[in-house]
Regions:
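Carbohydrate-interacting regions of secretory-pathway proteins
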Residues: 17-244
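Bacterial Sec-dependent N-terminal signal peptides
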Residues: 1-22
């Protein structure tokens, strides 16, 4: 299995520092305690958009996939901002569903959460049109959305659970999917700026997003973890974070 330099370095640091920090559950499997809905449509209500079903957070869509999708907003874990961490979760999507997991997100008045944060893409690759857009599959599941494709692309079909992990340490970020490392990149570097310049978040295409993302995490390089409501049925469970 491919192993990130970051993962090796973090492991060495943790060993040298004594006992490993314990992972903390962000979701108790029963209710949405600790989570806050940020809705873009005033006609929507948090209690119907986000529910708990069989021990999982369910984002409730139209049931019509892309044809009936309506962007609902985001669900953020509002109890704490995270800086260096390892986030693990499981997800599954309905047919044609689109969602994502945000990290280092900021609350910006008048702006949706997602424009301030990198996104671990969550998608039904086989049935959502976004899978064929972007460049080289960089809008498929586990990709850094619209910037880096997840390789290998090992997402399971809709209706099946996937395991996922995001590791962030001093600006180095690694995405994992179903037990495999699928990408690595470095925030706040010339590489990061170059990726933004080539994406839908470029200064020319989306200046508000660019200004936030170029220094994502803000002055302290920390932020919220969030789940995207893109108008489709998606489930998340076993959401755990370990601070590094």
């Amino acid at each position: 299995m491919k192993k990130s330099i970051l993962a090796v370095a973090v492991a060495a640091i943790l060993i040298s520092c004594g006992p490993k920090p314990a992972a903390v559950s962000l979701f108790n499997g029963k209710d949405l305690n600790g989570w806050t809905a940020v809705l873009e449509d005033s006609t929507l209500h948090p209690s119907t958009e986000f529910t708990v079903e069989d021990g999982a957070i369910k984002i409730n869509g139209s049931g019509m996939g892309e044809a009936g999708a309506q962007d609902g907003g985001d669900l953020i874990y509002a109890n704490k901002k995270f800086k260096n961490f390892e986030l693990e979760f499981e997800y599954k999507v309905d047919k044609g569903a689109n969602s994502g997991v945000f990290y280092l997100a900021q609350e910006i008045p008048g702006q949706p959460i997602f424009i301030s944060a990198p996104e671990y893409q969550v998608l039904d690759n086989a049935n959502h049109p976004d899978a064929k857009l972007g460049v080289d599959g960089n809008r498929q599941s586990a990709s850094l959305y619209d910037m880096i494709p997840a390789k290998p692309q090992n997402a399971k079909p809709f209706g099946e659970w996937n395991t996922a992990k995001i590791m962030v340490y001093n600006g180095t970020v690694v995405h994992y999917q179903n037990g495999e490392q699928v990408l690595e990149y470095h925030l706040w570097t010339p590489q990061w700026k170059e990726m933004l310049d080539k994406s839908k978040f470029s200064k020319e295409k989306w200046p508000e997003a660019y200004d936030l993302l170029i220094n994502c995490g803000g002055e302290n390089h920390e932020g919220y973890i969030g789940l995207q409501d893109h108008g489709d049925d998606v489930w998340f469970r076993n959401i755990r974070v370990k601070e590094l």
